[in-house]
Amino acid sequence: MNKMNNIFLIISSIILSIVIFVSGECAIDFSSEISVGISDSQWSCLASNNQRVIIQVWSGGGQYNSNISSVVSAAEQAGFDNIDLYAFLCSECDGNYPASSAIQSLVSSLKSDGINFNMLWIDVEQCDGCWGAESDNADYVQEAVETAQGLGVLVGVYSSEGEWPQTVGNLSTLSQYPLWYAHYDDNPSFSDTAFYEFGGWTSPAMKQYIGNTNQCGVSVDLDFYGSGSGCSTSSGSASGSASGSASGSASGSNSGSSNSGSSNSGSSNSGSNSGSSNSGSGNSGSSNSGSASGSGTGSGSSI
């Protein structure tokens, strides 16, 4: 009888864990510029509305986010225990080539700063003057991802159905990594199959479904993973006027092909300081997908 009770308790714990994971599906992301201006009360508000935060740690022009330690600390103190980082690297940006050196520098800095994080997302999108030929770009992105993995980092890819082929052509050798895709359809679900089936991916890990909106007085992008049933939509997410692009630099023009691919997709905020402020082209085909089995909910990167 005791054995049966123990089995029942174990099964119950597993079911409860699954329920907690599925219901905790709302996330936000923002740039390094936005992250340094968030007050303690805003952090608390963001943590009460989301279970996950993704913070920019590297921009092609500005490189390593020197404030990342204090920003991650503020997120932890607010209650976030699922903290991801994203890095926008570009082959033509100073200090970004080769990709292996840029990733090694990034990981070394994170280790020196004692940063605890879950997943590192490699941001792949267009910006003015950031990239070379598609085949060279593909080699660069693959080198970045594989270098990060080789250093013991949990790594995924962020992109969209429009930005991916514009940047890396038909690259499909990274589909075993989690994919976070952008498609601005105001719909926290994975029902938009056509927008994440690119680059060899067939299922997503996370979706950026609203770009450059306002939550708790902070300019953010809205994302979801899991069921998405409790995530905000445009009718309920805004709390004041937006304060600017959630990520990406204010310098540069909207270069990411403003109407390529399907409407309302592409990343609104992750460009580098040297590239476009909205390099993900507000209307470029969406999509960051990635294998659902590697959604970045593990124990974090060991660096």
From Swiss-Prot:
Residues 1-24 form the signal peptide. The keyword Repeat applies. Keywords: Antimicrobial, Bacteriolytic enzyme, Glycoprotein, Glycosidase, Hydrolase, Repeat, Secreted, Signal. Residues 226-303 are annotated as: S-G-S motif repeats. GO terms for cellular component: extracellular region. It is found in: Secreted. Residues 236-303 are annotated as: Disordered. Glycans are attached at residues 67, 170. Residues 293-303 have a biased composition (Gly residues). Disruption phenotype: In the absence of CF50, secreted countin is degraded suggesting that it may protect countin from degradation. Residues 28-240 form the Ch-type lysozyme domain. GO terms for biological process: cell differentiation; cell motility; cell wall macromolecule catabolic process; cell-cell adhesion; defense response to bacterium; glucose homeostasis; killing of cells of another organism; negative regulation of aggregate size involved in sorocarp development. Residues 236-292 have a biased composition (Low complexity). Transmembrane segments: none annotated. It catalyses: Hydrolysis of (1->4)-beta-linkages between N-acetylmuramic acid and N-acetyl-D-glucosamine residues in a peptidoglycan and between N-acetyl-D-glucosamine residues in chitodextrins. The keyword Cytoplasm does not apply. The active site is at 125. GO terms for molecular function: lysozyme activity. Its EC number is 3.2.1.17. Monomer. Component of the counting factor (CF) complex, which includes cf60, cf50, cf45-1 and ctnA. PANTHER family: COUNTING FACTOR 45-1-RELATED, LYSOZYME PROTEIN. Belongs to the glycosyl hydrolase 25 family. Cell-counting factor that limits the maximum size of the multicellular structure during aggregation. Has a very low lysozyme activity. This is Counting factor 50. It comes from Dictyostelium discoideum (Social amoeba). The gene is cf50-1.
